C-alpha cells in the first residue's frame, strides 16, 4: 500500500536509521521529537479529513498511542505493530502483530543487526487490505544505541478495508 508519510523520532538512532532507509526507498518522511502535535495540526488532520491515507513510523509509545486514537475518527486502524524491547542479554525482542504475510517476512529480524532499517523495508510492503492478524516473537542480535529507549514501536496505520 502506498504510504502518505513515514514518521520517525529524531531523538533516537534506531528511528533515524529507519527514516534514512524509508527515504532511500522513496517514502516521504517526517521527523518529530516525541510530540506529534505539530504533525497532527499542520498535516495529518487536514489530509485525513480529505481522505484517509496510510502512515507508518518508528517511535516511542506516546506518538503511536495518540495517532492511533486520532485515526479511529477517520476509519483507520493500526494494521501492523512491532514492539522492540532491548533485553538484558544484549539482544532485542520483536513482538510482532499483523498480517501473516508480514510475519513471515519479519522472521528475518532474528538475523538482522540493523533491524530498524529492515523495518522500513517491511512497513513499505504492508498489504492494503486488513486480513487476519497473527502474532509472533522474534529475538535477534543488536547493539543498543545509547540514545535509544528500552522500548520502541514500529507501526502502520491504514484505512480499514476488509479482505
Where are these regions (language model features)?
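Extracytoplasmic/lumenal soluble domains of exported proteins with redox or metal-associated functions
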Residues: 2-163
Amino acid at each position: 500500500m502506498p504510504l502518505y508519510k513515514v514518521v520517525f523520532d529524531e531523538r533516537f538512532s534506531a528511528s533515524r536509521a529507519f527514516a534514512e532507509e524509508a527515504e532511500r526507498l522513496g517514502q516521504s518522511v517526517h521527523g518529530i521529537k516525541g510530540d506529534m502535535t505539530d504533525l497532527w495540526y499542520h498535516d495529518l488532520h487536514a489530509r485525513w479529513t480529505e481522505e484517509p491515507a496510510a502512515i507508518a513510523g518508528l517511535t516511542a509509545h506516546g506518538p503511536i498511542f495518540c495517532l492511533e486514537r486520532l485515526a479511529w475518527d477517520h476509519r483507520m486502524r493500526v494494521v501492523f505493530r512491532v514492539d522492540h524491547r532491548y533485553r538484558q542479554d544484549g539482544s532485542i525482542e520483536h513482538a510482532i502483530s499483523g498480517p501473516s504475510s508480514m510475519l513471515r517476512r519479519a522472521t528475518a529480524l532474528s538475523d538482522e543487526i540493523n533491524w530498524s532499517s529492515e523495518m522500513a523495508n517491511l512497513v513499505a510492503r504492508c498489504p492494503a487490505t486488513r486480513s487476519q492478524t497473527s502474532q509472533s516473537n522474534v529475538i535477534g542480535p543488536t547493539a543498543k544505541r545509547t540514545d535509544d529507549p528500552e522500548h520502541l514501536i514500529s507501526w502502520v496505520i491504514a484505512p480499514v478495508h476488509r479482505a
